[in-house]
Design a protein with these regions (language model features):
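C-terminal transmembrane helix and the adjacent membrane-cytosol boundary/short C-terminal tail
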Residues: 2-15, 92-93, 162-177, 183-184, ...
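Membrane-water interface segments at the C-terminal ends of transmembrane alpha-helices
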Residues: 8-40, 52-166, 194-214, 219-221, ...
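Peri-membrane helix termini and adjoining interfacial loops of integral membrane proteins
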Residues: 36-44, 120-132, 222-232, 273-281, ...
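A short amphipathic helical element positioned immediately N-terminal to and/or at the very start
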Residues: 43-51, 187, 334-343
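P-loop potassium selectivity filter motif centered on the GYG triad
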Residues: 47, 230, 238, 339-341, ...
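Polytopic alpha-helical membrane proteins, predominantly small-molecule transporters/carriers
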Residues: 60, 180-181, 189
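Glycine-rich helix-loop "coupling/hinge" segments at transmembrane-helix boundaries
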Residues: 117, 215-242, 328-332, 498-525, ...
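Extracellular/periplasmic ectodomains of large secreted or surface enzymes and adhesion receptors
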Residues: 288-296, 322, 330, 334
């Protein structure tokens, strides 16, 4: 009997390892092997050939310049906003935080569309500048890409830094003050130094997000002939050259090496700040400003955030209701035909249906599998759980365009002789989405699981409850609020995804992001703007609904704890009564 149990356990473990290798590791290995494949066999010929091309060197240089420039913008603005919101006594902090996080909630290609709408060549701003004898602003340039990417990545640095700032003990500041330091000196000598690992870590994440981003350089760079590695991989993949896929794989490996190296460096700085994870965040005011200074800073920050995050969106909203793109808005120009056109377009309706189906399916799969893995990680850690977490992290760390290409190479024939025929179908998109976003659910569910004491499960099991009852009555009600927060980000990312679908979708499986991209590339800017408006409204509505539901689920958590404590007390009292009897 014991031998049978061991054999069954071994078979289950072997199957799990096989699935991990098949889904996460094998596609990356296939991609690497494809980069070495040439007419003579396996060699470094593809690397030598590509590095000799001027366009390749230009793409690498552009990628580095754009990533460094946008990271500098994100690091400066993200850190500054974090200091202001965490430490000063400015009011409307929830509004300020929403304005800062807006580029994180809205897809980057919609933000790019809004900026291109604001600075269109026939638009009000450029026409005014031209009338004044000044040069027009061109966002279809390296400077434009840097600016838009920098604004898109501000929330990444902000979220990394603000939590660290709130965890720095006030005792350290007061100790510095007693030594004669002023508030400014204490902030520079103590808080800034303590927060530096988080600032560097956030900056590296912003750098990785910049080299991973396909949408911004595709929308602004392809038409103006500015190649970066992500768009260059896309160009090579859709070309029909004899060696196009091998060359695309080679470029993908180069981009992946940069991304993985950055991830490892970020991990080093992340560990330096991980020692403060157990410290509770302090929301007290540390830099009290006078009423006048507070108002100037508060309204100045709100104005600046509105200029970089709201004004471009308003311009895009205006374009969605215009007959002609890029001209001054007048009553003669007002129309709702753009919205009528997109909702009567079968391709658009199919894309919305596909995206909703993929987003919902991806969320359900990630919740079930991700939460199960997180439970095992927290309660029963082991080598298999570590392997699946590392593998899922790898597929999230590499750029999306690289993952998409690896999916093509792998799933055409995942095992020798087996051809599932899923390329160009919803199935390969679903596999790619789950592979891409599973780690977000694992980390979110693991964090939520850590907040639930094992004693709750042990007490429930001791009282005779089944595993299903423990999950249904205790774990799920306590997990649902934090788990839903992670799931919402997966849902929005999957719903508005562009990079994976640009490589994996076919005529009948186009997604929302791909339709907007196609409209923009075809010059149908008004239709792209109209569809983007619909997506922005849907995403923001979902964001506010999730926040509202989170407050309701918090009350449910409190009721679960109260109910459980009451039943435990009754059980104890009952045992005492029986014992005394």
């Amino acid at each position: 009997m014991e031998t049978l149990k061991k054999g069954k356990k071994y078979a289950i473990h072997s199957l799990c390892y096989l699935l991990i290798i098949l889904v996460f590791i094998a596609p990356i290995v296939r991609l690497f092997l494809m980069s070495l494949k040439s007419e003579e066999g396996y060699s470094l010929w593809n690397y030598a050939l590509l590095l000799q091309e001027d366009r390749t060197r230009k793409a690498i240089l552009n990628t580095i310049v754009i990533a460094v420039g946008s990271t500098a913008i994100a690091a400066i603005l993200g850190s500054a906003f974090a200091f202001i919101i965490a430490y000063t006594n400015v009011r409307r902090k929830r509004l300020l935080e929403l304005l800062v996080l807006l580029p994180f909630i809205i897809p980057s290609y919609i933000i790019t569309l809004s900026w291109s709408s604001l600075f269109s060549q026939k638009g009000t701003i450029n026409q005014t500048l031209s009338a004044m004898g000044l040069g027009k602003i061109n966002v279809y340039s390296i400077a434009g890409i840097i600016l838009v990417l920098g604004f898109c990545n501000v929330p990444i640095v902000y979220m990394n830094v603000i939590h660290m700032l709130r965890k720095i003990p006030t005792d350290m500041e007061w100790a510095a003050r007693t030594c004669g330091y002023g508030i400014g000196q204490a902030m520079l000598k103590i808080n800034l130094v303590q927060a530096m690992p988080a600032i560097i870590s956030g900056s590296i994440l912003a750098f990785l997000a910049a080299i991973d981003n396909f949408a911004v350089p595709a929308f602004l760079g392809i038409s103006s002939g500015i190649p970066v590695l992500s768009t260059y991989i896309y160009e090579k993949s859709i070309s029909f050259g004899p060696n196009s896929f091998s060359l695309a794989a080679t470029l993908s490996v180069i981009l992946s090496v940069i991304a993985v190296a950055g991830t490892l460096v970020e991990g080093i700085f992340g560990k330096k700040s991980s020692g403060m994870e157990s410290i509770k965040e302090d929301y007290s005011v540390r830099i009290p400003l006078s009423s006048g200074k507070r108002k100037v800073l508060q309204y100045g920050v709100i104005l600046f955030l509105c200029i970089i995050n709201i004004v471009p969106l308003i311009s895009m909203f205006t374009s969605a209701f215009q007959k002609n793109y890029g001209v001054k808005m007048t009553l003669d120009q007002f129309t709702t035909d753009n919205f009528t056109a997109i909702f009567q377009n079968k391709g658009v309706l199919d894309a919305i249906r596909n995206s909703l189906m993929l987003a919902c399916g991806c969320c359900i799969i990630c919740i079930v599998i991700g939460t199960a893995i997180a439970y095992q990680k927290v309660r029963h850690p082991g080598r298999m759980i570590t392997l699946v977490e590392k593998s899922a992290s790898l597929t999230y760390a590499i750029p999306g365009i690289v993952l998409a290409l690896s999916m093509i190479f792998h799933w055409i024939e995942p095992l020798p002789g087996i051809r599932p025929g899923i390329y160009g179908t919803i199935s390969i998109l679903m596999i790619a989405y789950v592979t891409r976003y599973l780690i977000l659910q694992i980390k979110g569910s693991a964090t939520a699981m850590l907040s639930i004491h094992p004693a709750l499960e042990e007490a429930a099991a001791a009282s005779g409850r089944s595993v299903f009852s423990v999950w249904g009555k205790i774990l799920i009600p306590l997990l649902i609020r934090p788990v839903l927060s992670s799931t919402f980000m997966i849902f929005v990312s999957a719903l508005t995804e562009l990079t994976l679908s640009s490589m994996l979708a076919a005529a009948g499986t186009k997604t929302i992001g791909l339709m907007i991209f196609n409209f923009q590339q075809a010059g149908d800017y008004n239709l792209a703007a109209a569809m983007s408006v619909v997506i922005v409204v849907l995403v923001l509505t979902g964001y506010f609904l999730i926040n509202h539901k989170n407050s309701e689920y918090k009350k449910v958590e409190e009721r679960v704890y109260e109910s459980f404590n009451r039943k435990c007390n009754q059980k104890v009292q009952s045992n005492i009564s029986i014992g005394s009897y």
